[in-house]
C-alpha cells in the first residue's frame, strides 16, 4: 500500500477518496500487488460533513413545517377578520323617498382600510360616510373599526335629539383619534354627510378625502369641495360644512382614492379618467355602471394584486322624484 504523497511513478486513478496504485513492474522494494488505500482521514471528514448536512436539512424541514403551521393559522385569522369586517358594512341600504343608494367594495386583500355606511338618522334624514385609513391590511382595518364606533352623528338628551353638523361630527371624531396617542402613524381621510329626503338638501364635510363627485341630471359634473385636514393628526381641527341642493336625476359619488389609482391615466391620481368612465355611462342605471366598472378592473393588468382598496357609494335621486 502506497500513500498518495509517496507515489513517483506508475498509473494512478482516484475514485471517491480511494487511491488505487498499479505498479508497472514488480520490484524488490515493493511487493507485487494491487493496493487499495482508503484515505481514512478524508473519509472521516466527508462523513462529518454529511452528518452536518443531514442535521441542517432536518432543521430546515422542521422550520419549514413550523412556518407552514403559522402561515396557515395566519390565513385562517385573516379570513375570520375579513368576515368580521364584512359585518361592519351595511347589509341593506335604506331607500327613503326618492333616494336610492348603491355601493361597490373591492378590498386589496383579506381586510380593507376602507369603510362606509349608509343609515337612517331620523324619519327625514339619511346619513352616509366613507373613511379610508392609511395603509392596508390589519392595522388599517382596525383603525376603520375604531372610526365606525367613534363617529357620533346625533346628540341625545332628555329633551330629544340634535343631528350634529357634518363638520362637528368629524371634529369630534378627529379629537378621539388624536387622544388615542397611538405610537404608529395612524390617520385617515373621511367624508360624512346627510341628505334630507324631503327637501333633497345635502350637507357634508370632508377630512382630507377625495372630493365627492356630483353628476347632475342635466349632464353637468361638479366636484363638491370643502376644507378639512386628515383625521388623527392635529387636535381641535376644524372641518368646513357645505351644503348643496340635489335635484331629480342627480347622482352623488363618494369614493376612496383607490378608484383614482385604478383608473389613473398618464398622470397618477388624476381624476379625469375616472370622470370619463362615469360620463361614458351616464345613461346607464347605476347598478350597471358599478358592474361595468368592476368588470373593467378585473380585466386590468395586475387586477389579482390591486394596489389599493376601492370603495364607491352612490346616492341617487330618482328621475321621477
Regions found by a protein language model. Give the residues of each.
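… and, occasionally, acidic/histidine-rich disordered N-termini of signaling adaptors
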Residues: 56-251, 302-321
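Short linear motifs in intrinsically disordered/low-complexity regions
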Residues: 7-9, 16, 30, 52, ...
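C-terminal catalytic subdomain
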Residues: 245-254, 259-321
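Residue-level detector of alpha-helix boundaries and kinks
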Residues: 52, 69-70, 158, 278, ...
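Interdomain signal-transducing alpha-helices
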Residues: 40, 44-47, 143, 147, ...
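Amphipathic alpha-helical coiled-coil "transmission" helices that mediate dimerization
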Residues: 26-76
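PAS-family sensory domains
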Residues: 15-20, 129-131, 255
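Non-catalytic regulatory/interaction regions at protein termini and inter-domain linkers
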Residues: 1-30, 91, 249, 287-307, ...
Amino acid at each position: 500500500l502506497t500513500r498518495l504523497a509517496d507515489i513517483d511513478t506508475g498509473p494512478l486513478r482516484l475514485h471517491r477518496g480511494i487511491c488505487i496504485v498499479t505498479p508497472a513492474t514488480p520490484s524488490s522494494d515493493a511487493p507485487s500487488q494491487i493496493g487499495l488505500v482508503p484515505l481514512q482521514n478524508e473519509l472521516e471528514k466527508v462523513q462529518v460533513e454529511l452528518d452536518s448536512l443531514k442535521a441542517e436539512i432536518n432543521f430546515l424541514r422542521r422550520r419549514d413545517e413550523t412556518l407552514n403551521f403559522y402561515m396557515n393559522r395566519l390565513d385562517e385569522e385573516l379570513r375570520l377578520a375579513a368576515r368580521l369586517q364584512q359585518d361592519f358594512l351595511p347589509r341593506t341600504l335604506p331607500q327613503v323617498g326618492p333616494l336610492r343608494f348603491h355601493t361597490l367594495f373591492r378590498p386589496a386583500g383579506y381586510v380593507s382600510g376602507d369603510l362606509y355606511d349608509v343609515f337612517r338618522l331620523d324619519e327625514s334624514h339619511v346619513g352616509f360616510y366613507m373613511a379610508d385609513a392609511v395603509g392596508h391590511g390589519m392595522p388599517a382595518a382596525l383603525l376603520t373599526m375604531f372610526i365606525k364606533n367613534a363617529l357620533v352623528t346625533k346628540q341625545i338628551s332628555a329633551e330629544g335629539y340634535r343631528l350634529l353638523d357634518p363638520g362637528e361630527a368629524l371634529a369630534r371624531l378627529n379629537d378621539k383619534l388624536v387622544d388615542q396617542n397611538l405610537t404608529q402613524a395612524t390617520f385617515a381621510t373621511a367624508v360624512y354627510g346627510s341628505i334630507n329626503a324631503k327637501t333633497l338638501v345635502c350637507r357634508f364635510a370632508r377630512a382630507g378625502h377625495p372630493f365627492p363627485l356630483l353628476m347632475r341630471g342635466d349632464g353637468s359634473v361638479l366636484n363638491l369641495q370643502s376644507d378639512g385636514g386628515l383625521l388623527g393628526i392635529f387636535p381641535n381641527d376644524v372641518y368646513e360644512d357645505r351644503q348643496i341642493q340635489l335635484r331629480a336625476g342627480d347622482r352623488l359619488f363618494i369614493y376612496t382614492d383607490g378608484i383614482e389609482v385604478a383608473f389613473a391615466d398618464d398622470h397618477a391620481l388624476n381624476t379625469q379618467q375616472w370622470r370619463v368612465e362615469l360620463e361614458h355611462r351616464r345613461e346607464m342605471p347605476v347598478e350597471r355602471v358599478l358592474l361595468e366598472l368592476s368588470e373593467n378592473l378585473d380585466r386590468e393588468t395586475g387586477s389579482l394584486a390591486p394596489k389599493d382598496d376601492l370603495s364607491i357609494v352612490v346616492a341617487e335621486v330618482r328621475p321621477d322624484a
